[in-house]
Design a protein with these regions (language model features):
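Polytopic transmembrane helical bundles with strong interfacial aromatic enrichment
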Residues: 1-320
């Protein structure tokens, strides 16, 4: 039996310290970049477009990103608990994500009241205020289900949240019911993709030799989710973004950034699936996929804040 020398132990310790510092620096840079995108993304995208100014775009982006994150984590945990089968499971985040989602929705109500110069009671009576109130109540009910140790019951309140957000995102007079239906499917599939993958990765850390089976089960669902996302995303884009203003509107520019991140996440997902088929370890590309999907969630929040591109297309047509 050989024992490591003091020099070997010190060298190992230095390597671990350097790795920890590198990871910490990477996390700090990613966090700073996320804050910058959230606070300044909508303004940068709208620069030079001549579009109407959106009040408090940075704060709105942060709050909507928090809502999307809460949905993804909670739905992903509900689906992941069924997918991963028997065995050790990670600690539940459902209660805190539901409470965070409720706080983010309530924060949007307060922000809407402030920018509209209305009191809270009057804000509740507006279309957006009423839908945000429904979202806050949905998250609160989901938190109550978790607190009562009935986590599966949270599916109903979370469905209310998704429906309210889909209706809020489509106030346009032209076929809003189609836009709402597309967003319901798109938001549900996106939440399950992001949250389900994160939950699967958290579970793999506890399963040891059975970790690969967890990712295999998730991959089966992810394929169908990707098809749903591609179909609904394409239809929504064709409905909402006129071809003549793809590069001249904030919506078009942000959408291009989102598609680039989705392409990165898709490539990483394919790499992970290829490793699974060969019997290898897919953890590393799956972790990178989660990071790319976090960027997608953030850019999606920016996309909900920028102006509807139709008016600029119409104005251009009238000026010709």
């Amino acid at each position: 039996v050989t024992t490591p020398t003091n020099g070997a132990v010190r060298a190992t310790g230095r390597r671990r310290t350097r790795a920890a510092l590198a990871i910490g620096a990477l996390v700090a840079v990613a966090g700073a970049s996320a804050v910058t995108v959230a606070l300044l993304g909508a303004g940068i995208a709208a620069r030079g477009t001549g579009e109407l100014h959106i009040p408090a775009p940075g704060t709105t982006t942060v709050l909507r990103a928090a809502v999307f994150t809460a949905l993804a984590l909670h739905l992903g945990e509900l689906a992941g608990a069924r997918l991963t089968g028997t065995g050790p499971t990670p600690r539940s985040w459902a209660l805190w994500t539901a409470l965070g989602g409720a706080a983010a929705a309530a924060g949007q109500i307060v922000l809407l009241a402030e920018v509209s110069d209305l009191d809270l009671t009057a804000t509740y009576g507006t279309r957006d205020g009423g839908l945000l109130l429904a979202m806050a109540n949905g998250f609160a009910l989901a938190a109550g289900c978790v607190a009562l140790r009935r986590p599966g019951w949270a599916t109903g309140p979370l469905a209310l949240v998704i429906g309210a957000e889909a209706m809020r995102a489509h106030p346009e007079p032209y076929t809003p019911e189609w836009g709402t239906a597309l967003t319901v499917v798109h938001l549900t599939a996106a939440s399950l993709w992001v949250g389900g993958l994160l939950y699967a990765l958290r579970t793999t850390r506890l399963r040891g030799g059975a970790a690969r089976e967890v990712l295999v089960r998730y991959a089966r669902l992810a394929g169908w989710l990707y098809v749903a996302l591609a179909a609904t995303g394409t239809c929504s884009t064709l409905r909402r973004l006129p071809a003549d203003v793809v590069f001249s509107t904030a919506y078009g520019r942000v959408l291009i950034a989102k598609l680039a991140l989705v392409a990165v996440a898709s490539a990483l997902a394919l790499a992970a699936r290829r490793r699974l088929r060969r019997g290898g370890d897919a953890t590393r590309p799956a972790r990178a996929e989660v990071a790319a999907l976090a960027g997608v969630v953030l850019v999606s929040a920016v996309l909900t804040v920028v102006p509807d591109p139709h008016w600029l297309s119409l104005r251009s047509a009238l000026l010709r």
